[in-house]
Amino acid sequence: MSESAKPRITSGSKFRNEHGFSAIKDGVKRSSSNTEGKSLERKPKWLRARMPGGERYDAVRRNVTEHRLSTVCQESHCPNIGECWTNGTATIMVMGSVCTRACKFCAVDTGNPKGWLDPEEPENTAKSVELMGLRYIVLTSVDRDDLPDGGAAHYAACVSAIKQRTPEVAVEALTPDFDAVMSDVEKVVDSGLDVFAQNVETVKRLTSRVRDPRAGYEKTLSVLAHAKKHRPDVLTKTSLMLGLGETEEEILETMDDLRAIGVDILTLGQYLRPTPNHLPVERYVTPEEFNRYRDIGLEKGFMEVPSGPMVRSSYRADRVFDKNNLGLSVPEVPVPDKAMQIPVKAVD
């Protein structure tokens, strides 16, 4: 087929080719050819999320829209968006909604933002946290390999702005790996956050199949280890998806690797395939297995191990922080009346 005859594919579209997955090409995410002809798997009965709705959910949604925020809840098609937003908690995705990497499990758009950042984002994010009356906020972001520091300074500015406006709010930062440039990692760790998170995503053997080639199992471990070494008082956290073909032995080995570098909190959840062009689910892990892995994780010394089919890395992170085995807690912050009165006009 000639170039002119090929169908036009918009930025971020997923498609297959004979070469399999090849990260980024003109803003297009390519997915593995082994998904050809496969439809989404039928989910077991325990994988059911309630439909989003309610006054608090609508307030959070309006706030996200009016303040031009990207949330991982929306971009990753998270099944828990209804529960989390109804409870007034949200995970805000900073630095835009286009990622420079193309992991094979992820629904977030892939492309080249060409160095663009919203200079108003730190202040808008801080104002939104205040308006929503949150006591715990998770900040995450796309990878920004197009920026010299991977976006570390901008990320740190977002955390600092929240702390300056609402110092009582606990902040968790679920960050990129910043290509393991530790001076950039330190910018975020020193920004005033309470929890530093970087997801290992899968077991070592499956990393090259599941994650973008620029990511890495050892790279993630090195970032988490450095964050803990640089600021021993900060809680460190990571997440592992199950159902991608890993064995129980590999799960336990991953737990041991994480505990060896002092990771405090581990979340375990079922991988759910976003589209037919993403990696297929190899199997659905039962709730009973998730409960057993939680018990094993606690025995290995993790402070907390949220584990279940619907658990995601930032799922009800406020409760995890409250209940961790150190006895640390987030101060109660009353929800202001204005949390339900989201302004129609966007913040300038």
Curated annotation (Swiss-Prot):
Biochemical pathway: Protein modification; protein lipoylation via endogenous pathway; protein N(6)-(lipoyl)lysine from octanoyl-[acyl-carrier-protein]: step 2/2
Top-rank EC class of the record's enzyme: transferase
UniProt: [4Fe-4S] cluster 1 binding residues: C73, C78, C84, S314
Binding residues annotated for [4Fe-4S] cluster 2, in chain numbering: C99, C103, C106
Highest taxon in the source lineage: Bacteria
EC identifiers of the protein: 2.8.1.8
Record flagged with keyword S-adenosyl-L-methionine: yes
Region feature (Disordered): 1-45
Record keywords: 4Fe-4S, Cytoplasm, Iron, Iron-sulfur, Metal-binding, S-adenosyl-L-methionine, Transferase
GO MF annotations in UniProt: 4 iron, 4 sulfur cluster binding; lipoate synthase activity; metal ion binding
Protein localization: Cytoplasm
Catalytic activity: [[Fe-S] cluster scaffold protein carrying a second [4Fe-4S](2+) cluster] + N(6)-octanoyl-L-lysyl-[protein] + 2 oxidized [2Fe-2S]-[ferredoxin] + 2 S-adenosyl-L-methionine + 4 H(+) = [[Fe-S] cluster scaffold protein] + N(6)-[(R)-dihydrolipoyl]-L-lysyl-[protein] + 4 Fe(3+) + 2 hydrogen sulfide + 2 5'-deoxyadenosine + 2 L-methionine + 2 reduced [2Fe-2S]-[ferredoxin]
Cofactor note as given: Binds 2 [4Fe-4S] clusters per subunit. One cluster is coordinated with 3 cysteines and an exchangeable S-adenosyl-L-methionine.
Every Radical SAM core domain range: 85-303
InterPro entries: Aldolase_TIM (IPR013785), Elp3/MiaA/NifB-like_rSAM (IPR006638), Lipoyl_synth (IPR003698), rSAM (IPR007197)
Chief location: cytoplasm
GO cellular component, one term: cytoplasm
Cofactor dependence: [4Fe-4S] cluster
Record family assignment: Belongs to the radical SAM superfamily. Lipoyl synthase family.
Protein name per Swiss-Prot or TrEMBL: Lipoyl synthase
Organism: Marinobacter nauticus (strain ATCC 700491 / DSM 11845 / VT8) (Marinobacter aquaeolei)
